[in-house]
């Protein structure tokens, strides 16, 4: 009788696993055919001071808009890239763990959200960093110098598999550099925190980096205020 019960339970488990597998396949098939036009806005990040960027949610994706820089569709790790994305939208696929950070002011914010491991390349030499952790990371080889904003080492950037370049508005003095990076398939995000009129608006850019580097705790304003 005991053996019979075990056999029945085993059969039920197999059936349940089969059903789950079928359901997963159906979900995967559905996910493989996501079209950008079918995405619906489901929410927005509430910003208290920053005016130079916004983040809107679309069915699990996030649309980041930077004033005078464009729109970026953030794709979570393991999630399919939607089809028919407009040409003016740049795709960012997480994890963004090979970032080329040129804007020096961003590093301290990245440090505060414990995301320095996502910075692989620097536009500042080791002795030019005022952020001690950045200097130490370069000493240990965790962050490599890849050239300043006006003369990046394209070969190194490609060899390291760079998946995001964060620049400041100085890049507009050398637009050919931005164009070259994009031509090589590297998305370029120009941060504009210096254009915020309110001092706390500049600090609120930390929440954007929380989104980019997948620190979901910073999505709410209350959590950001605790930093």
Task: Label every model-predicted segment.
Residues 1-9:
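Bacterial N-terminal signal peptides that target proteins for export
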Residues 10-17:
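Hydrophobic helical h-region of N-terminal Sec-dependent signal peptides
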Residues 19-21:
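C-terminal motif of bacterial Sec signal peptides marking the signal peptidase cleavage site
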Residues 23-25:
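Bacterial signal peptide processing site
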Residues 29-39:
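Short Lys/Arg-enriched alpha/beta "domain-start" segment
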Residues 62-158, 164-171:
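A short, structured surface patch at a secondary-structure boundary
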Residues 174-214:
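Charged, glycine-enriched surface loops/patches
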Residues 219-227:
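Conserved small/polar residues in nucleotide/adenosyl-binding loops
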